[in-house]
């Protein structure tokens, strides 16, 4: 029971990420249909031309190959939407393969962010996508 309690939020966070990827895959998100959503991480050159490890909880290419959805999943409260979005865009713009796409940053959040950038999807939105 203690082990479950100690790792419960970590477990829920992992399931939330998977649910968000499943919700994006093959579905219409803000008017665009995306292919298979995956987790992506790797080393890129940052603004100072130094190697930097970046990670995306959700990444999916639109079926017409014009848009690249990059997403951050947070199962916590009190997130700063504008700050998270700025960081998502910063990281996405470091990706060499992202140059040919319009980047679509999406925050998948448990609760509405305290500083909303207008790109948050809450749990009810994710569930709605899966219907």
Task: Please annotate each region the language model reported.
Residues 1-131:
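A cross-kingdom feature that marks ATP-driven nucleic-acid transaction machinery
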């Amino acid at each position: 029971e203690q082990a479950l309690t100690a790792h419960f939020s970590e477990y829920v966070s992992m399931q939330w990420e998977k649910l968000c990827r499943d919700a994006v895959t093959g579905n219409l998100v803000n008017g665009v249909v995306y292919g298979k959503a995956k987790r992506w991480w790797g080393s890129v050159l940052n603004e100072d031309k130094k190697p930097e490890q970046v990670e995306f909880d959700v990444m999916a290419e639109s079926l017409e190959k014009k848009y690249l959805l990059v997403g951050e999943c947070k199962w916590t409260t009190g997130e700063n939407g504008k700050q998270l979005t700025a960081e998502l865009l910063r990281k996405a713009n470091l990706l060499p393969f992202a140059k040919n796409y319009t980047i679509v940053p999406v925050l998948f959040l448990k609760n509405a962010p305290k500083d909303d950038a207008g790109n948050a999807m809450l749990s009810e939105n994710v569930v709605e996508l899966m219907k």
